[in-house]
Each structure stands twice: as structure tokens, then as C-alpha cells.
Amino acid sequence: MTKRERIIQSVLVKVPKDAINQFLSHGSTPISVLFLAALVGVLAGLVGTYFEIAVHFVSETRTEWLKSEIGHLLPLWLAAILISAALAFVGYFLVHRFAPEAAGSGIPEIEGAMDNIRPVRWWRVIPVKFFGGMGALGSGMVLGREGPTVQMGGAVGRMVTDIFRVKDDDTRHSLLASGAAGGLAAAFNAPLAGIMFVVEEMRPQFRYSLISIRAVIISAVMANIVFRAINGQDAVITMPQYQPPELKALWLFLLLGGLFGVFGVLFNKLVTVAQDAFVALHKNDRKRYLITGTCLGGIFGLLLLYVPELTGGGIHLIPDVTNGNYSVSLLVMLFVGRVLTTLICFGSGAPGGIFAPMLALGTLFGYAFGATAKILLPDLPIEPGMFAIAGMGALFAATVRAPITGILLVIEMTNNYYLILPLIITSLGAVICAQICGGKPIYSQLLHRTIKNDKLRQQDLPEQQNS
């Protein structure tokens, strides 16, 4: 064995004795944590960016097949059903067979892992979420890629700690949180929102310290640099740039926030109802689960042909709405329709998130509210698009209960920095109203539901064995 081979072997195999382990063991040297946080950010950025590219590729390929090859062999409606059903089947099968924790958004799983009550099987979650998400999102279901990107980012953070054999619990925790921040930063091209999401939304689980906050910041920045290097530096959503509204119009934003606060509480409860309904339908039986998911995929494949506005994550719909392409009545119908399709898709347990669908809902209702206000108050100088942007932040704030994150997220996604004041008013109004109504943050609600169901399953196992 040559000297070079001996060195490589010592690095890869005898990790406790190598230079990397010594580097990490210097009394929790901050530079070591920050170095690993940067690595986590780069990897989370790569995973998140290429996940977006992969989902877009699947969607475009599906469309091309319908236009050319399969569309000529079969009736168009049948081809659309079969393609989307097959894509959905892949997503549901991978989740149920290899990583049930990859169902849904995945953010509650990361929060549970930060509390040491949920495992992070990164070697399963990352591939299942990546390829399963490609299938589910590519089929046209109303799901977002942002939640999966956060879960994969957190899994990348745990992967790095395992590969480098990091033993310190605080460091492992910091890198898990750093991965989640990097995932969100890469998903939305929003580094500030990625940082604040961990600090604000995950505040019950996040261990605040100077080192952990620095690690989160570095990871989010590195992930965003990777995203911009691959996808460019444009905002995720292209829309008009608005000037700040006049002060006498700000009360309308507060009213809009109150409406979203009430709806946010109702929406969170309906999510749980939808999940329970699907569990009662398939009873965690794999065959029933796959049949349910495959049928849903086929239905949304058909909707893609005739009512595409009711399909997909909804990011593509936001510019059309803010450009004034829909009447108020049509916006209300689309809002109601997308509420139903969002609940169906997310409640079914498909590997996809709810971030993007919620932003689309906020846009639809917000623009309808603004257009109605402009008709009723013609002397007030307002633009309906302002309320669409405010609605995005308000619904996020009401459901996730993270107003600062929602404000930063919308500003970074749309580049509408002049609307920060109406965004603050709308988001805070939504949060306060949601608290008065007694609602709970959606991800905490989903985590508690997961833990409760796991306990019930564990209690049922001895009874089944005894019987």
C-alpha cells in the first residue's frame, strides 16, 4: 500500500484519529461548526435547486408527451389520466414502502427531530422525498416543493453530522436547523426568510445561541448562493412593483388580516379533518393507499387539461392574478376550488408541501378583496395587487403563526419592498385574530397528530400480538 493510499484509508476509515475529527473536537471550536454549516448550506442548496429543476422537467415532459407521442396513440383525456396516475403512484409507493415520514410537508418531522422525538433517516428520506416529490408534484397535484426542500435540507444537516461523526448534541441540533434554513432559502430564493423561519417558526425547538444562529445564517446564505449560481438572481415570482399605499388606506389591510386570521384557523382544522378522512379511507393498508393516490393523480391529470388553475403548487398562477386576468367572481370560485384541492392533495399523504398552495390562496382572496374595495371605494387610491401580496403574507402568518417569516418571504419572492408596512399590518392582524380564535400553528398541530398516531399504533401492537 502506498503512502497516499494509507492517508486516504486513515481519512475515510479511521475517522476518530484523522485531522477532521481533531478539528471538530477542539472544545466545540466555533469555526468547526461554521465550516460544517457552510457545507450543509451548499449541499442543501444543491438538493433544493435540482429538486426544483427535476420537478419542472417532469412537468414539461408530461406536457410534451401529451402534445406529441402518447397524445396521438390514445384519447387526450385518457393519456392525461394515465400519465399523472403513474407519476402519483411512484410518489405514494416510495413513501409507503421506504419512508412513511416523507409523507406530507416534512417540516413537522424536522421540528420533531429538533426535539429529539422523531428520527431522521436521511439515507431514506432524501431519495424518497426527491423522487417521490418529482412524481407527486409532476402529476399536477396541488402541492408545493418548499416543505420537501426544508425536510431534505434538514436531512442533509443530519447526514453531515453522521458522516463527520459529530457527537456534540448542540452541534448536531444546530446543523439540523441549518439544513432546514438552507432548504427554505433555496426553495424560495429567500435567505432572510430561511433564517427567520428557523428562528421564529421553530422557536419552541430551536436552541438559541450565538453559534447556532451564526450556523443558520451561514447555511442559508450558502444555499442561496448555490441557487442563484444555477437558476439566476431573479425573484421567484415576476409581478408588478407597487408603490406604498396612502396612509388612509391602511385600515383595509388590517381588515384583510382579520379575515385571513379567521380563515387560517378554519383551514388548519380542515387540514386535520382531511388527513383523518384519508386515513379512515385507506386504513394504512398499502394497497388502498396506492389505489387512493393513483386515482387522485389521474383526476388531477384530467383537471390539468380543462381547469389548470386548480392544479399545481400555484406559484405559476400568482402573476396571472396580479396582472388582472380574472374577474372577482372567478377569483372567488378559484379560491374555493383551490381550498378543496389543497386539502385533498395534502390530506392524502402525498410527498409534497403546503407553502406554495397557501401563497396562491392568499393571492386569490387578497386580489378579490382589493378589487372589491376599489369598486366600493372609488375615491381611495389603491391597487388590488397590493392586497394580493399582503394576502400571501397574511395567510402564511395565520396558519404557520410566523408573521415576520411571512413578511420577509413575500418581500423576497416578489421584490416589493415598498409594501413592507401594509404587509406588517396585514400579517400581524391575521396572527392576532388567529390567536383570539384559539387556533394552533399548523406544523405544531401536524407534529402532535403524528406523535399521537404513533402512540396509538404502538398500543395496538401488543393487542394484535396477543390476539
Curated annotation (Swiss-Prot):
Chain positions of motif Selectivity filter part_1: 104-108
Motif Selectivity filter part_3 per UniProt: ranges: 353-357
Intervals, Periplasmic compartment: 68-74, 231-250, 308-327, 375-384
Transmembrane segments: 31-67, 75-98, 122-139, 146-164, 213-230, 251-279, 286-307, 328-347, 353-374, 420-436
Coiled coil start-end: none
Keyword ATP-binding: no
GO cellular component, one term: plasma membrane
CDD domains tied to this protein: EriC
Binding site for chloride: 105, 354-355, 443
Species, as recorded: Vibrio vulnificus (strain YJ016)
Keywords of this entry: Antiport, Cell inner membrane, Cell membrane, Chloride, Ion transport, Membrane, Transmembrane, Transmembrane helix, Transport
Gene that this sequence comes from: clcA
Catalytic activity: 2 chloride(in) + H(+)(out) = 2 chloride(out) + H(+)(in)
Record family assignment: Belongs to the chloride channel (TC 2.A.49) family. ClcA subfamily.
Ranges within the bilayer without spanning: 107-114, 175-187, 191-199, 385-399, 400-402, 403-414, 415-419
Subunit annotation: Homodimer.
Membrane topology value: Multi-pass membrane protein
Location in or out of the cell: Cell inner membrane
Marked site: Mediates proton transfer from the outer aqueous phase to the interior of the protein: 146
Lineage per the UniProt record: Bacteria, Pseudomonadati, Pseudomonadota, Gammaproteobacteria, Vibrionales
One MF annotation (Gene Ontology) recorded for this entry: antiporter activity
Pfam family, one: Voltage_CLC
Protein name, UniProt field: H(+)/Cl(-) exchange transporter ClcA
HAMAP family: CLC_ClcA
UniProt-annotated site: Mediates proton transfer from the protein to the inner aqueous phase, residues: 201
Protein function: Proton-coupled chloride transporter. Functions as antiport system and exchanges two chloride ions for 1 proton. Probably acts as an electrical shunt for an outwardly-directed proton pump that is linked to amino acid decarboxylation, as part of the extreme acid resistance (XAR) response.
